[in-house]
């Protein structure tokens, strides 16, 4: 059971190639490092680069912040599948976004920290609360529901 797992250290997580955990690949990767993972919380760090596809006029857009949150969720799912269940990366879908509030947007070369706290997981669905910080400054908060593509009993891929 995942909740009884001994979770990895920050040093181990920082050494992971984030590309192993995500279905997205460059130039669409919006997180740099996975820095904390346990049965409830996932934390990723990201440096905003000027070549990021969601940067406009030197600032990461709101859409970029949302994609960063979604990919933090994906990194959690990817770690669990790759390291615990020895499965390939699974495709996830945003099922719902609620109460997305933007307080500020980060600039290029700034580091943001995204924290996702799982509130409930059932039948391949994860309900979580997320926040994005730059240092001690809150940039965004939201509630997000993620669905993971599952195989059915006949082995046919379905959503």
Enumerate the predicted regions with their spans.
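Beta-strand-rich interaction surfaces with strong enrichment in secreted/lumenal proteins
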Residues: 19, 33, 57, 101-104
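Hydrophobic beta-strand-centered segment that forms part of the acyl-chain substrate-binding groove
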Residues: 11-12, 77-113
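Catalytic strand-loop segment that frames the active site of acyl-thioester-processing enzymes
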Residues: 25-61
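Extreme N-terminal tail/first-helix region
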Residues: 1-22
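HotDog/MaoC-like acyl-thioester-processing domains
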Residues: 2-8, 75, 107-113, 117-159
